[in-house]
């Protein structure tokens, strides 16, 4: 396993839609393991393949933050998952505002409104289709990482003014990291 370099915004790869995984082979399995290792090293909750420069529809999440009181039956708010070719099949009408951050937009966090619950289907490393009902931070992380796979940075959910300010700050931080 290895720690992969994380792509920092602004970068074209972060706003490019990732392609479907057509063959779940040893290279994909190694990528998933490397992504978990990279995410843990960076102290993140999730990481999309595009964030390590691989334009494939894969992400990993590990949410052990909380459990939700009065959680709907069958929904989970914690867990460690990798998802290949994920697709949200259901989103709740109920929404919640929480602060989000991103490994590709370091040193920033912003309040983002997202659906509270979701259902997602995805492939596992055995090419079997799985379905997960998620809530809380797990649902939020899945939505955030799926946005990455669709070429959408979480700051796109902000007003234009706040987005522009966030990108300007990201550019300054990226220049500092490159020096």
Swiss-Prot record:
Keyword field contains Protein biosynthesis: yes
Active site at 145
Q: Which domain of life is it from?
A: Bacteria
Q: Which GO biological process annotations does it have?
A: translation
**Keywords, comma-separated and alphabetical:** Hydrolase, Iron, Metal-binding, Protein biosynthesis
Gene3D superfamilies the record matches: Peptide deformylase
Please report a single Pfam family linked to this protein: Pep_deformylase
Q: What is its EC number?
A: 3.5.1.88
Task: List the CDD domains hit by this protein, alphabetically.
Answer: Pep_deformylase (cd00487)
What function does this protein fulfil? Removes the formyl group from the N-terminal Met of newly synthesized proteins. Requires at least a dipeptide for an efficient rate of reaction. N-terminal L-methionine is a prerequisite for activity but the enzyme has broad specificity at other positions.
Q: Identify this protein by name.
A: Peptide deformylase
Organism of origin is Wolbachia sp. subsp. Drosophila simulans (strain wRi)
């Amino acid at each position: 396993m290895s720690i992969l370099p994380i792509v920092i915004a602004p970068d074209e790869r972060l706003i490019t839609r990732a392609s479907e995984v057509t063959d779940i082979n040893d290279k994909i399995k190694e990528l998933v393991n490397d992504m978990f290792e990279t995410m843990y090293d960076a102290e993140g909750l999730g990481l999309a393949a595009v964030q390590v420069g691989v334009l494939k529809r894969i992400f990993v999440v590990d949410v052990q933050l909380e459990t939700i009181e009065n959680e709907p039956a069958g929904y989970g708010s914690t867990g460690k998952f990798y998802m290949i070719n994920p697709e949200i099949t259901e989103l709740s009408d109920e929404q919640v505002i929480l602060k989000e951050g991103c490994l590709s937009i370091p040193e920033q966090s912003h309040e983002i409104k997202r659906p509270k619950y979701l259902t997602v289907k995805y492939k596992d490393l055995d090419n079997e289709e799985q379905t997960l009902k998620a809530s809380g931070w797990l649902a939020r992380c899945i939505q955030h990482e799926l946005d990455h796979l669709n070429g959408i940075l979480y700051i796109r959910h902000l007003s234009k003014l706040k987005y522009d300010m966030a990108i300007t700050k990201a550019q300054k931080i990226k220049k500092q990291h490159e020096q």
